[in-house]
Amino acid sequence: MVNKKQQILRINKLIIFLLIFSFCGGGSETSETVEEAQDTTTTTEAQDTTTTTEAQDTTTTTEAQDTTTTTEAQDTSTFVSWANVKGPPMIYAASDVSQSTIDKTLKWYEIASSAWGEFGPAEIWIVGNSKETVSDLEDLWCDIRTEKDKKWNKEWDCANEYWSPFARYVDDGGAAVSTYYRDYIDYHFFLVTMGPKYPSPDEDDYKVVTMHEYFHIYQHAHISNIDDEGPSSAIRDEKMGGADKPWFAEGGAEYMAQLLYSRQPNVRSNYLKEIMDRKAYSIGEYLDYGKPLKDLTYSDPVQTYDIGTWLVAYIVDKVGEETFRVNFYKDLDGLGFEESFKKHFGMGSDQLISEFDEWIKQPVDELLKIIP
């Protein structure tokens, strides 16, 4: 059994190694050529992640300036996002997470950020398979949070008997993005949590999931309303397609991630059609269920992610990738969800979904004709 101090030290060594790696890495792995300009902030300041050293069971942090530059053309006409810090993310991993998993996570995160623009600050926390190492990761989380933000509430926002930021990922795997853009803290950031149990880092799905989560960062970075657990939060939810309504946010993240992955070197040419064919199995249950797509929640017994992915594929086929990813999100904050939807997709969301619901009744072979 490795004692607590040794485990934290192992975590810290991974952080230091990865920080060095992130400076040496970059977008050279990215093969996608996107015709449209990228919708990013114009801020040139880039603050990198922290290196961590152990001292009496606490962590100390020193900042290093990142000199990485993005070679892709950037859209300088977008509003100045709150998430305007460029540079590689901070990565923290449990001591039982392999270096290859850390490297793979960073690689596919950077492929996505190179294609869609850099937004941050962001932190990636990779959970392992052991409750013991997760406990140490939770301790590190609290140390980092309280060091970066004096307003951080240790009693409620560090791991306790009622809540943990990472524990469920040990058994369930998965991934998520949390937006810490809140009125009761001073340091605002994105939290990307990766649970490598499902999908495994050895699977192609892990690469896609990493990019899927980055697209959620892209989405949230285009919304200026702060989370105040009140009116501003409600507006923020509305701009994501509705509170607890995954149809647009998840559909967009999934389709854009799958599309980007399909363009990478050595990915089979029919990959995207195969994925969308698989997702088409959910169409029948959606049509039979009878509940409007916009009203489906995460708890409904319908694969809303799959239907949302097909909806976004349908939108992209109608108006183009640039209109969906760049123009819609550029106007989202100022116009609101529905008005930006009408402006760029030619009709309101209810009308477009009604049209889509008729379209997906066709044989799957016909549907797949819109997939590149």
At which residue positions do the language-model features occur?
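C-terminal motif of bacterial Sec signal peptides marking the signal peptidase cleavage site
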Residues: 22-23
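N-terminal secretory signal peptides that target proteins for export/translocation
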Residues: 1-9
